[in-house]
Amino acid sequence: MRIAVDAMGGDYAPEEIIKGALLAHRYLQVGIALVGRPDALEPFLPRPLPPGITVVPAEEVVGMAEEPLAVRRKPQASINVSMQQVRAKQADAVVAAGNTGATMAAAYLNLGRLAGIDRPAIGALLPTLKGKPVLLLDVGANVDCRPRFLEQFARMGSLYCQCVLGIEKPRVGLLNIGEEPNKGNDLALATHQRLTQLPGIHFAGNAEGRDVLTGDFDVVVCDGFVGNALLKFAESVGQVITQVLREELPRGWRGKLGCWLLQPNLKQVKRRMDYVEYGGALLLGVNGICVITHGSSKAAMVYHAIRLAKEAAEQKILQRLQAEMADSHPSKVNAGENAPPLASASNPSPEALPVGSLDRVEG
């Protein structure tokens, strides 16, 4: 097992990215390909390099503030080279903490879409009251969606829960403003009808915002605009709770004593609500395994992102998606036709990217 890590992407690259990758190599027994400028990586690398750690040179970088399609102008950008490692089967997955839009664009250019997929989706795992995560998708790849896109998200999410999380019959919910089938906008109404009639998934109906973290659903689908807003709100919950407890518990001697007695429990609460534990989000629907983690990721989150990528590769999620989606929804685009040859990746066809979606991708 070998994971390609874009060591140049993220607010704390390359130092924290390398630290997280070294932790993953040590504790997960996984090979790591650190992709980036050798001169930038060198100060943070142990010498000699441990067996299983390699450096793959990439002389260009797509900055956090650059537009997604900057990957076209920078064929030797670290995110492009990372994707090419998977394309050439020199790595089993990619982990990236850089520009989300650029990561998506690089995945489209170098890996292509799976057959039967109109738009790949970013799926994020969130903690729930029942202790098991819920998969929310899309959380930013497609700010505007059609009903068939959400139908495909539901299928991919259900397969992920079966393969990676071991849930035999995942409960799929459609994020909406009410439980009733007749609630919502045109997209929600049309999608509800399609999901009700869709074989192969267990559609459990509409999920209201308050239902997402209860654990009653295993998969919740929505468009990327709503999903990204919900994701960032959910990520703030743990931080807000922790801050309130820090401010209120130490008041007076009783509070200080209670804080000391409750310390193990409070640590457990923080761990359950901490999004760092979930590592990042999977880009589902491209012809390769790609985990997108926060631009603000430090070593711990990079470690968990690599763990997520490793689990997805070990459970053969890509092969399952390739088989299931191609059979269920034939598309004009398939994995063999959609990705440009490696030799021409620096001059891709404009049709290779869904520009209308990527130029507004949410980070």
Curated annotation (Swiss-Prot):
Broad class of the protein's primary localization: cytoplasm
Source organism superkingdom: Bacteria
EC number of this enzyme: 2.3.1.274
Protein location: Cytoplasm
Compositional bias segments (type: Low complexity): 337-354
Spans annotated as Disordered: 326-363
Pathway assigned to this chain's UniProt record: Lipid metabolism; phospholipid metabolism
Family: Belongs to the PlsX family.
Function: Catalyzes the reversible formation of acyl-phosphate (acyl-PO(4)) from acyl-[acyl-carrier-protein] (acyl-ACP). This enzyme utilizes acyl-ACP as fatty acyl donor, but not acyl-CoA.
Record note on quaternary structure: Homodimer. Probably interacts with PlsY.
Protein name from the UniProt record: Phosphate acyltransferase
Organism lineage string: Bacteria, Bacillati, Cyanobacteriota, Cyanophyceae, Synechococcales
Primary gene name: plsX
